[in-house]
Amino acid sequence: MRVAIIGMGTAGVSVLRELVKHPKFNQLDIDLYDDKVNMGQGVPFQNDSSELLINMPSKKMSLNLDDETEFWKWYKQQTDFNFDEPAYLPRFVFGHYMKSYLSMFTKKYPNISTNYNKVQEIYTNSNIDETNLTYYICTTNSGQSWQAYDYVFLTCGTFAYHDPYNLKGKKGYIATPYPTYNTLDEVNELDDIAIIGTGLASLDVVRYVAAHHPKLPITMTSRSAHLPSVRGTMIDVTFKYLTKDKLNDIKKHHFGNAPLDTLVSLFLKECAEYDIDFKKLVHRRTGNHIADLKYDLARPTEMGIFQSMIEHLKENLNWIWNSLSIEDQHQFNQKYSKMIQLNSNPMPPRTAELIIELIENKSLILKKDLEDVKHDGKLYYFSYKNQESVDIYNVVINATGAKSHLNELDQDDQLIKNLENRQIVQAHPMGGIQIIPEANQVISPRFGTLTNMIAIGQMTNGVNKLRNGVKMIVEQVAHTVSQLYDALESNEQQQRSDNQ
């Protein structure tokens, strides 16, 4: 069986790790596709400044669901990197951990090949009425260079960043913040810099720019200007009310769906079990960034339990989210998505302490109520609600986060646009592409369920709601890779039957 893995970041490497475990792995011919920069590391963990920290404790990050300390053990055994404060390691170190496994596998198994070209096209040229599809992968726009595959994993990573003010291509606009050590390449020492976005990506930019750009302060701005929370001391959590059995029982009485209000009530009962006042903590922010960060820093136990509850909710959100009606999914997005995002994926305490220091010494300005950004060919003009004058900058760094809907994509995500145009994938109303929940099999508007095409990661965000962390991606992989070997066994049985 010929297998293609398209994208070799967290999801792609995890797929390969699962595949090699099977006794029939040697019956596969596997081609890995990515460029030389991202092969084995992916964009989030690419080589970058050591100031960019993983937002999870090093001892809690792993591609191994059975050993959450695997990354930490790898770090302690290797000799290339050594850091004074390894509790939160630089992000690129995790990339090298992933890449070490890819290197080991490609050396050990002769049936793995690497292709350092970006995939431009995926198509199927099946006969009419034929449902057993072969997929053709091209690394050129002309379609002259292609390879045929029986099974495809779409592990392409996140979509490109939003461009909310249509600034892409303008001088002084940096459309993506990564790698951060390139953000200042074309910036003059006296340039005033603004960062659009106040999430984790913007904090990465601040860490780097504040350390390397002489003209301060930097301005970080968005509509709300909410910062992520600060990571506390995480604990293991088990739900006793919001469970699959309970949800299945609820669905029996509500036409196959579970009412959102009922599920929220069950989650609040879970919080009460751990003595967490969920509503108080959700609304704890005062708008004073220093006070809010210090609040979190002073309560590592309470914040850690609170964050652990949200993290456990996210880990189980696939079956919760997909039990909701469309109407309730819209309600969830309006009322709870932002709330969860603000309180999950917290920043390391070290980052919070740096942000406080930068604000206090006037090296960083945080502003809310951003309404518009204009460019006159030379400068950028930021307008704010309830502010008559505009703020003027030479350079704008975009840290708004990745797009989520297919209708937002442009040439930066041309492969996905081509797949949609050829009716191999279709848009999910809540974001990303349509897949079968749990199985992650792509649903095509032309061919129906593509049992031999698996999509994993942010491109499935309409089904795998808010489940784009490393552990959640690895869990998706673990649930789906066995399907390939089921298909291989089915093919072998069919061949035996045909030969009789």
Tell me the role of every PLM-derived stretch.
Residues 43-90:
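Active-site-adjacent segment of FAD-dependent monooxygenases/related oxidoreductases
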Residues 1-37, 43, 81-488, 498-500:
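Flavin (primarily FAD) cofactor-binding/catalytic cores of flavoenzymes
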